[in-house]
Amino acid sequence: VSCNVDGMPSWNALIQNMAKAIDYSRCDTCRHRLESCENTCLLKDDFSTDELLKVPQHVFNKDQELYYRILNESIPAVTADAPLSSAIFDINPAHIITTNYDQLLESSKNIFCEQYQVIVYDKDLLNADKGKYIIKMHGDLSDASSIVLKEQDYLDYSQKHVLIELFIKSLLTDHIVLFLGYSLNDYNIKLILSWLNYMRSQNGAFDVDRRVGYLILDQE
């Protein structure tokens, strides 16, 4: 969703910025490599799902200051009243779950935005005083340490975000869910959906009518 706003990078673009900082590409192992192709080849940044996690982890392990600087430089502090954000609030969903780090949703001028409370940490759920949430399950750029991007962040997610993960699982269990612009390659999303399918299969829920989910993706 954020990619529809000028200056906001995609997940791949953010990892490409980190890869360039440590001179990492797929060229050294590419079987299509030619001496003259390195600067124009589109395959050099065609990272696997595994690399999308390991590249930021390598940057962090090598230089934490560089890691956080790339994050802050790659994701601008934009608080635009994005039309798509406003359209989401017009639907008036029970809750909004986002993997984006920016503040485009909560900065919307849509009148319904005021009904929602931002949730970044487990403690935010415990202290919430509103009935609707914007759950930023991968953190917020205002606190770079909260961001879930590198491999270790994903490995530690279930331990560090116990309440948020449980809450998301409960929403997927008894709500109709609209996935808008999500990458179903996201490690957290795949794990949660896998858990949900397992629970349904173990309890015979596939044999009865159940709530459905909808997925909208950009074909590009």
Positions of predicted regions on the chain:
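Conserved catalytic-core helix/loop/strand module for nucleotide-ribose chemistry
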Residues: 1-176, 184-220
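Glycine-rich adenosine-cofactor-binding loop
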Residues: 181
